[in-house]
Amino acid sequence: MIEVLTTTDSQKLLHQLNALLEQESRCQPKVCGLRLIESAHDNGLRMTARLRDFEVKDLLSLTQFFGFDTETFSLAVNLLDRFLSKMKVQPKHLGCVGLSCFYLAVKSIEEERNVPLATDLIRISQYRFTVSDLMRMEKIVLEKVCWKVKATTAFQFLQLYYSLLQENLPLERRNNINFERLEAQLKACHCRIIFSKAKPSVLALSIIALEIQAQKCVELTEGIECLQKLSKINGRDLTFWQELVSKCLTEYSSNKCSKPNVQKLKWIVSGRTARQLKHSYYRIAHLPTIPEMVP
């Protein structure tokens, strides 16, 4: 049982979980603001769910291009949705808003040596605004999120839940659940605005619970129930979001869903620009396909 694990590592993880749960409600998007975006008609003048989702896919492409952590992407999405749920953003300004949120997340999470120059980031993103525009928008975003860049994200819960479940398994069974696959599933969910209305803990547990069902890891079912209890997650809420996650992942795996395309970033980097960029910038990562499990 997770709640009675006595190893030092387990106790540290449980302490971290309690701290995250305590902070969870802070620095999250306004649900009422997200609903307004979802209900908006696509007339070219108002922010819509479709435009928001396309912007997040572009941010995911940048994350893959630069080789940044999923945590960076998750925080960028949090910042973007917090801003969009508060402000009436015109579609023509969305690119600058999105890149500003992304850059804030990068500077907050990534090592300083891996942070790209603003000029390089704008060029690779294929935008026409200036560094001054980006810096000005950064300041606006910071003011509207009350200068609170750090936030509790679904990725943090995903890491903790996964680690706690691993502690509950014998060594020979710890490879049954692939964390990279869970990360890819979370990225897919982030590309849909509806999942920003879910509590980060609920979204993370929904993804893990579905994966455990899919891989038939029955020995972890009790662990999921313990995590649900520890996190004070309502059973109906968990079922509701699991169904939405399942639908999202099914659509994401189909040809109907437009996936982030990091390859388009590859072609706009000239030879001169490529030589000027740090080597780590020019690693073209694979598209964020959800990896298959090895039987």
Curated annotation (Swiss-Prot):
The lineage of its organism: Eukaryota, Metazoa, Chordata, Craniata, Vertebrata. The keyword Nucleus applies. May play a role in growth regulation. Is associated with G2/M phase arrest in response to DNA damage. May be an intermediate by which p53 mediates its role as an inhibitor of cellular proliferation. Its main location: nucleus. Keywords: Cell cycle, Cell division, Cyclin, Mitosis, Nucleus. InterPro entries: Cyclin (IPR039361), Cyclin-like_dom (IPR013763), Cyclin-like_sf (IPR036915), Cyclin_N (IPR006671). Disulfide bonds: none annotated. GO terms for biological process: cell division. Gene3D superfamilies: Cyclin-like. It comes from the Eukaryota. The gene is CCNG1. It is found in: Nucleus. It holds the Pfam family Cyclin_N. PANTHER family: CYCLINS. This is Cyclin-G1. GO terms for cellular component: nucleus. Belongs to the cyclin family. Cyclin G subfamily.
